[in-house]
From Swiss-Prot:
Organism listed in the record: Salmonella heidelberg (strain SL476)
Pathway(s) where this gene product acts: Cofactor biosynthesis; NAD(+) biosynthesis; nicotinate D-ribonucleotide from nicotinate: step 1/1
GO molecular function: nicotinate phosphoribosyltransferase activity
NCBIfam families the UniProt entry points to: NAPRTase (TIGR01514), PRK05321.1 (NF003704)
InterPro entries linked to this entry: N/Namide_PRibTrfase, NAPRTase_N, Nic_PRibTrfase, Nic_PRibTrfase-Fam, Nicotinate_pribotase-like_C
GO terms (BP aspect): NAD biosynthetic process via the salvage pathway
Family according to the record: Belongs to the NAPRTase family.
Name this polypeptide is given: Nicotinate phosphoribosyltransferase
Key word Ligase present: yes
C-alpha cells in the first residue's frame, strides 16, 4: 500500500518538546552513544500492510530542516544553548537508520544509530503511522467529527466541574504521537485555547504557531540508556536524575517515575533530588495510589507537597482528570496531560496503541519495568532479572 498524497510532516518541530530537551542533553553529554529502538503495537492491529506507505514517509522526512523562523523562536526559549541549536540547524533525518518491514502482517520497525539522531524519530514516526492508518481506515472522518466530539465532552466537563474551584486545574495537550491527523490536533488545540485551564501543548510546532507554552521534560529512554551508560546498574537511575540536573539545573524539572517502578524510583529520589526537581510525572499504574505515595514521600522528607507539582499523563480523559483533581487539588499542585483522548477521539475511529521504545544502548540491552506490567519492554530476560535484583524488585514482571 503506497502513494499517500503528500508528506504527513511539514516541520522538524512537529514533535514532542521533550525530544528536543533530551536531544540537547544527549548532544552535550553522550554525543557518541549508540542505540536501538523498536516499534510495538500493543493492540491486535495488523499494520504490516502499511509498511510501504510508511517507508515512503520515512524517506520524505530527510527533507525536513529547521527553518530560520523556527531557529529564532527556539533561540528565545530559556533552556536551549547556541551550540546545540546551531547543530540542530544542520540536522537531517537519515532514513538509513530506519528498517520498516511487513512481518506476516505485523509491522516491524527498528531504529539504529547515534542516540543524538535516533532520538528524533519516535514521535513523528508514530504520528505518521497513526495518520496513515486512519487515512485508509476512516477516510470520511476528520476535523469536524473531532470538534463535535470535543464539544460534547466539554459540555459534560462543565457539568462535572460546576461545584469545583478550577483555578488550579491545568490541562496540556500530549496528543502528537497517536493523533488522528496533524489537522485534527491543531483544531483541537485551537479550540482548547479558549478555555482558561488549558495551559499548553507538548508539540513544539503547535506551540510556536499558536503562541502556546511548550510542555515536556524527559521520557523513559533517558533512564533506560543510563542502565548501560552508568558503570553501576544499581545507581543508574540516580545517574540519570543527576545528569538531567547537570543539563537543566533550574528548569524542566518534572521527573518521570516509572521506568523501574515508582517504589524503586522513590528509593533513589532523596532529599537533594526531591528538593531540586519541581515535581513528578505519572505514566503507569494506579494514579491515586501513585499520588499518595508521592505526597507521603515529600512529607517524609520534610517538603511541603504544595510546593511541588504532580503531572498525570497515563491514558487520561477529561473525566479521569477531574476525578484526580477532586482527590488531590488541596494537597499538591497538579497538571494533566491528555493525548489520545483529545487528538484521536472520534466516533467509529479506533485509536492505535503504538509505541517506539529503546531496546539497546551501546549494543547492550535496556529495559522498562513500569508500574503497569503490560508496558514492560525488553528482549533479554537475564537483563530483566539483573535489573530486578539491582533495584530490589521482588515481583516477577514478564518481559515482552
Amino acid at each position: 500500500m503506497t502513494q499517500f498524497a503528500s508528506p504527513v510532516l511539514h516541520s522538524l518541530l512537529d514533535t514532542d518538546a521533550y525530544k528536543l530537551h533530551m536531544q540537547q542533553a544527549v548532544f552535550h553529554h553522550y554525543y557518541d552513544v549508540q542505540v536501538a529502538a523498536e516499534f510495538r503495537c500493543r493492540g491486535d492491529d495488523l499494520l504490516g500492510i502499511y509498511a510501504d506507505a510508511i517507508r515512503e514517509q520515512v524517506d520524505a522526512m530527510q527533507h525536513l530542516r529547521l527553518q530560520e523562523d523556527e531557529f529564532q523562536w527556539l533561540s528565545g526559549l530559556p533552556f536551549f544553548k547556541p551550540d546545540y541549536l546551531n547543530w540542530l540547524r544542520e540536522f537531517r533525518y537519515n532514513p538509513d537508520q530506519v528498517c520498516v518491514t511487513n512481518d506476516n502482517g505485523k509491522l516491524h520497525i527498528r531504529l539504529t544509530g547515534p542516540w543524538r539522531e535516533v532520538i528524533m524519530w519516535e514521535v513523528p514516526l508514530l504520528a505518521v503511522i497513526s495518520e496513515l492508518v486512519h487515512h485508509y481506515r476512516s477516510p470520511n472522518a476528520g476535523v469536524d467529527q473531532a470538534l463535535d466530539a470535543l464539544e460534547s465532552k466539554l459540555v459534560d466537563f462543565t457539568a462535572l466541574t460546576a461545584d469545583l474551584d478550577m483555578s488550579r486545574f491545568h490541562l496540556m495537550d500530549f496528543g502528537t504521537r497517536r493523533r488522528f491527523s496533524r489537522e485534527v490536533q491543531q483544531a483541537i488545540v485551537k479550540r482548547l485555547q479558549q478555555e482558561s485551564w488549558f495551559v499548553g501543548t507538548s508539540n513544539y510546532d503547535l506551540a510556536r504557531r499558536l503562541a502556546l507554552t511548550p510542555m515536556g521534560t524527559q521520557a523513559h529512554e533517558w533512564f533506560q540508556a543510563h542502565q548501560q551508560i552508568s558503570p553501576d546498574l544499581a545507581t543508574s537511575q540516580r545517574a540519570a536524575l543527576a545528569a538531567w540536573l547537570n543539563e537543566y539545573p533550574d528548569q524542566l524539572g518534572i521527573a518521570l517515575t516509572d521506568c523501574i517502578t515508582m517504589d524503586a524510583f522513590l528509593r533513589d529520589f532523596g532529599i537533594e533530588f526531591a528538593s531540586r526537581y519541581q515535581g513528578l510525572r505519572h505514566d503507569s499504574g494506579d494514579p491515586v495510589a501513585w499520588g499518595e505515595k508521592a505526597i507521603a514521600h515529600y512529607e517524609k522528607l520534610g517538603i511541603d507537597p504544595l510546593t511541588k507539582t504532580l503531572v498525570f499523563s497515563d491514558n487520561l480523559d477529561l473525566q479521569k482528570a477531574v476525578e484526580l483533581y477532586r482527590h488531590f487539588a488541596s494537597r499538591v499542585q497538579l497538571s494533566f496531560g491528555i493525548g489520545t483522548r483529545l487528538t484521536c477521539d472520534i466516533p467509529q475511529v479506533k485509536p492505535l496503541n503504538i509505541v517506539i521504545k529503546l531496546v539497546e544502548c551501546n549494543g547492550k540491552p535496556v529495559a522498562k519495568l513500569s508500574d503497569s506490567p503490560g508496558k514492560t519492554i525488553c528482549h533479554d530476560k537475564a537483563f530483566v532479572r539483573a535489573l530486578r535484583k539491582a533495584f530490589d524488585l521482588p515481583q516477577v514482571r514478564k518481559a515482552s
